[in-house]
């Protein structure tokens, strides 16, 4: 096979990248073309994303690829975080910055909607984990508040769909990102119009759902001219970053659980059909769309967000730590002294994460962590124990064997947390690839254009092209006692 080039745009809640993938003789090489910061913008008391700035950064990435690297990619694809969306008017113009999912306007939306549509019914109809920022609740909050923005909204597009639209001029909703909305019929490409209309959301604002691996069209003449590009297809990859990441799990057997570790930790299994029952509702599991007819049965766990936030607060206070330095502080601190529930709502978007952690520990009669090392150790111990808790829940509701955990994404670089996770769960850990989302994005493009044949073939290429690190459980610490303490303070 001659070298084939694909450009992935991978946007996260804190940064975005343009990554060039070179596929050559079943080996994949990655080159970072462009990197930029992303953060929520606080404007008039609400949090927004600056989609116009983000699109400019993506165009810069394409321009660099063409002009600085001298490469015309065969295609481009975009993935982002889930649930957030853009409003367009009837002329097809974006009429507002999109709200960010951590905005407080949805704080009461779940309970308010349950007065109209009972929680049990909503879960049975969608199979999606209840989180106050799901698109369903964001839209319902706007309907409930009689938002003037809704009155002039002709269509909505989720973040990757909106960026695809800006590139191609084509409005579609890709399956994996649409599934995060809590508004589709499980395992299908159909909107749940019964639920949508019960929530008062105008059904006509929703776009046709397409499967990942659909060619939307070519970049517009305007984009081509601005970036110096030739005609390039825009492919709707798995627009939800986690869905793209799971594609790159380097395992060809169906005996694994995964943790896609970044700002969020997404932990689950890949299955053919949704798991929807009263038990999965009570455990608050989600069934999101995957690639190749798969369902991502998983739970969203607050992940590196906790570390990112304490790091940010301490930097504002004049103490700047690198990630390795923070790990070393944790390593030197006493294990299991303080434990938190990472998913407690008080950690969603506090003004001071360090104080929020101290408050939780105080309220659960543990005392309070004083040193930075104690705070960091508390976070890492608690995440590892949360992974064990989630693993046991998955095993309770599914008979799918789990013999290994694959940790992918940026968190795969955290060898300290990986070892804690192996110790806590008693399972072998395989860490890598770290650029899982970009790899999945790229390989879906390659499959769409006929250069790769199947999901299994993709995963073999990833395994052959990646440096993987393995972690084996140790019994140096009493994790069973720690787990029992964790249950006492978090349940």
Which residues does each PLM region occupy?
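N-terminal glycine/serine-rich phosphate-binding loop of ATP-dependent small-molecule kinases
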Residues: 1-96, 124, 224-234, 425-427
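Active-site core segments that coordinate phosphate-bearing ligands/cofactors
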Residues: 2, 7-8, 20, 107, ...
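Short glycine/proline- and acidic residue-enriched helix-loop micro-motifs
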Residues: 44-48, 119-129, 205
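Short acidic-aromatic active-site loops that bind/stabilize oxyanions
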Residues: 47-55, 128, 132, 209-213, ...
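Short beta-strand-loop/turn "lid" adjacent to the catalytic site in phosphate-handling enzymes
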Residues: 63, 67-101, 129-133, 164-185, ...
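Short glycine-rich phosphate-binding loop at a beta-alpha junction
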Residues: 72-80, 155, 208, 400-409
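Glycine-rich beta-strand-to-loop/alpha-helix junction loops that act as flexible
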Residues: 79-83, 212-213, 261-264, 404-412
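A conserved helix-loop-beta module that forms one wall/lid of the active-site cleft
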Residues: 200-212
